[in-house]
Amino acid sequence: MKNTMKRMFCSMTVLVTAPYNEEGRKELENLFGSVAYQSWKEQGRAYREDELIQLLKATNATGLITELDQVTDSVFASVPELSFVGVCRGMPSNVDVAAASKRGIPVFYTPGRNAQAVAEMFIGNVISFLRHTSASNQWLKDGEWDSDYLQAYVKFKGNELTGKTVGMIGFGAVGQRIAKLLTAFDCKIKYYDPYIQDDHPLYEKASLKTVFSDSDIVSVHLPRTEETLGLIDRQYFDLMKESAIFVNTSRAVVVNREDLLFVLKEHKISGAILDVFYHEPPEESDYELISLPNVLATPHLAGATFEVEDHHVTILNKALKKWKGEKTLNIQTMYNKDALKTGG
């Protein structure tokens, strides 16, 4: 880590391949010296490993800010001058963190950057599902309204969100932001999260089974880990109310696909709102879910707002200022701080 800290105080170039607004880039210039901006958006895809190495070498970069590129052990080995990596994602899943830690390189990330975006889309999609907005919109466009006004009034009469019990599986930044927005609807919030030790003053901590059995809406907010793969299966779906809705905006693989397909086809629950799939773009097996009439599906859009890019700039620049200014590893958004403290 000493070499990393020493390099940090010299004027350096930061290669930025993530979308980064002009104000954020100016802050980086003031902080480090210069910025080489090569956003992946310019070519419409992430840089390949060889392209990333070439870019880092061509720009003499000693810092990297990325969003999509795979930052592998080979990248670190090829560019030993790297002093930090910033990742504009909720988890630095595209970076070989162990390889970075071994070399004393801190990896920063931006948890919660899309919390507001996902929370707003959750509210919108749930209301759309409850009020049959998508179906009624298509029905109207298809010219089906051929009787009096009561035809649609009766056919698409739905339910209100207000007063519903909403269960959260995982209660991190996104889950808590959703809960905050739901207070405007007088919803009761129950959450399951084994990593939150203390009870929340406003919301009810509950077991996984209780969240599924008591909720009108169950929403999943879990990362992909060995622990969560296939966690949500038939034993939990069978606990849900027949009128309940299942929502997944996190990762498809935390849910057993066949079990979800069964309960939807058999109308064991009211339906599902899905923004993530087992293959993206979807394959035939995914379309079996997507095409069901009681599924509201969107193409992984929950975090897709322009403001999310502003949020990750704010979060990352704040961390980098603290790291450089205070010469500290005690930064909440430094993902591998514990490994660096113990020597990798």
Curated annotation (Swiss-Prot):
Keywords: NAD, Oxidoreductase
Induction: Induced by sulfate, part of the yoaDCB operon.
Gene Ontology molecular functions: NAD binding; phosphoglycerate dehydrogenase activity
Enzyme class: oxidoreductase
PROSITE patterns referenced in this protein's UniProt entry, alphabetically: D_2_HYDROXYACID_DH_2
Gene3D superfamilies, per the entry: NAD(P)-binding Rossmann-like Domain
CDD domains associated with the record: 2-Hacid_dh_10
Enzyme Commission designation: 1.1.1.-
Active site positions, chain numbering: R251, E280, H300
Top-level lineage group: Bacteria
Pfam families: 2-Hacid_dh, 2-Hacid_dh_C
Keyword Plastid annotated: no
InterPro entries reported for this sequence: D-iso_2-hydroxyacid_DH_PdxB, D-isomer_2_OHA_DH_cat_dom, D-isomer_DH_CS, D-isomer_DH_NAD-bd, NAD(P)-bd_dom_sf
Ligand binding (NAD(+)): D193, D275
One annotated GO biological process: L-serine biosynthetic process
Family in the record: Belongs to the D-isomer specific 2-hydroxyacid dehydrogenase family.
Name recorded for this polypeptide: Putative 2-hydroxyacid dehydrogenase YoaD
Organism: Bacillus subtilis (strain 168)
Lineage: Bacteria, Bacillati, Bacillota, Bacilli, Bacillales
